[in-house]
């Protein structure tokens, strides 16, 4: 691996080893890095970092693409069922790869239940929809999930219950789900950055879940004086998640807390935490709310190409369904 990186200008065996230790295992990782990130590595100057990045971008053929090429790339997108046909319809077929989907809502609105159900559905071939002309079939073989839990709400027994409700082995789902408990924002960001190591180790990570995205940031950065620092850090985290989605054709799901809108006289009285940083970085944004009994309402209110719409789904003992 170090021999490959030495093809870059100014990168000898020693520098290559430092890059690998820092997680820069291939040209694409270097090509999508910033000069500041590379200069954090001992012995790499700004000038050397700029040369490395430009050379890596040339080797990865990064640059302008025609609309036809982008349309062809879109054919590699695959989708995962949420468990609810109505919610899948709102999403034009299901949760989409190469994107970040946010589910925000009050406690008990169903955010974590959707995350658990997604881990289960990933192991069911009939819940995965792909255009086999655009997706290499082997790419979706033996898919695995990563679940970064920041609130201590991941319940393996609930995953087993949902799996058995669909007639599959719950142990299989758990075997293919990596779980990490993050107690602060630094741990949360580190776990997200380590996902590439899992992929390089031969794990076919196709689903990444952060539950919840903003709770650690919200707890650590209190008051207006720390808002700018919080948003900058959150922005870097979202950039990591978007990069994972793009480079590895995986689905990224995040849950989000809400806060009251004191100036809201009409309409929605809550708003998702994270402000414009999360708003611009998330591809699809849902707001969840409780309805009667086991029913929940999911409102899609932000998407690059889908209209605003709502879906009603149920949270049952067997999982998410219509």
From Swiss-Prot:
Disulfide pairings: none
* Residues that coordinate or bind ATP: 105-112
Which InterPro entries does the UniProt entry name for this protein?
A: AAA+_ATPase, DNA_recomb/repair_Rad51_C, DNA_recomb/repair_RadA, DNA_recomb/repair_RecA-like, DNA_repair_Rad51/TF_NusA_a-hlx, Hlx-hairpin-Hlx_DNA-bd_motif, P-loop_NTPase, RecA_ATP-bd
**GO molecular function annotation:** ATP binding; ATP hydrolysis activity; ATP-dependent DNA damage sensor activity; damaged DNA binding
Q: Name one GO biological process term.
A: DNA repair
Alphabetically ordered keywords of this record: ATP-binding, DNA damage, DNA recombination, DNA-binding, Nucleotide-binding
SMART domains in the cross-refs: AAA (SM00382), HhH1 (SM00278)
Q: Which domain of life is it from?
A: Archaea
Free-text function comment from the UniProt entry: Involved in DNA repair and in homologous recombination. Binds and assemble on single-stranded DNA to form a nucleoprotein filament. Hydrolyzes ATP in a ssDNA-dependent manner and promotes DNA strand exchange between homologous DNA molecules.
Tell me the protein family, please. Belongs to the eukaryotic RecA-like protein family.
Q: What is this protein called?
A: DNA repair and recombination protein RadA
Q: Where does this protein come from, organism-wise? A: Methanococcus maripaludis (strain C7 / ATCC BAA-1331)
- State the organism's lineage: Archaea, Methanobacteriati, Methanobacteriota, Methanomada group, Methanococci
């Amino acid at each position: 691996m170090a021999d490959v990186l030495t093809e870059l200008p100014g990168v000898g065996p020693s520098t290559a080893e430092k890059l690998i230790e820092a997680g820069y295992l291939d040209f694409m990782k270097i090509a999508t890095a910033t000069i500041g990130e590379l200069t954090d590595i001992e012995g790499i100057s700004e000038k050397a970092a700029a040369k490395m990045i430009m050379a890596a971008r040339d080797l990865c053929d990064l640059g302008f693409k025609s609309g036809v090429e982008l349309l062809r790339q879109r054919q590699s997108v695959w989708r995962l069922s949420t468990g609810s046909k109505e919610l899948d319809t709102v999403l034009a077929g299901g949760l989409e790869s190469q994107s970040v989907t946010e589910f925000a809502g009050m406690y008990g609105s169903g955010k974590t239940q959707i995350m658990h159900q997604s881990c289960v559905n990933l192991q069911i071939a009939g819940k995965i929809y792909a255009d086999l002309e655009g997706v290499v079939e082997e790419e979706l073989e033996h898919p695995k999930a990563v679940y970064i839990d920041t609130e201590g709400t991941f319940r393996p027994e609930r995953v087993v219950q949902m799996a058995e409700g669909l007639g599959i082995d719950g142990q299989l789902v758990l075997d293919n789900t990596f779980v990490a408990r993050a107690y602060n924002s630094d741990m949360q960001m580190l776990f997200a950055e380590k996902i590439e190591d899992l992929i390089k180790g031969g794990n076919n990570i196709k689903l990444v879940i952060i539950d919840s995205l903003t709770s650690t940031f919200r707890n650590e950065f209190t008051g207006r004086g720390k808002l700018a620092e919080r948003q900058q850090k959150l922005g870097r985290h979202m950039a990591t998640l978007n990069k994972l989605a793009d480079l590895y054709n995986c689905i990224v799901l995040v849950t989000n807390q809400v806060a009251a809108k004191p100036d809201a006289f009409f309409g929605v009285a809550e708003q998702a935490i994270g402000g414009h940083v999360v708003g611009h970085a998330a591809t699809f944004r849902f707001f969840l709310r409780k309805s009667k009994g086991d029913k929940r309402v999911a409102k899609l209110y932000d998407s690059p190409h889908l209209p605003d719409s709502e879906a009603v789904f149920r949270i049952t003992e067997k999982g998410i369904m219509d």
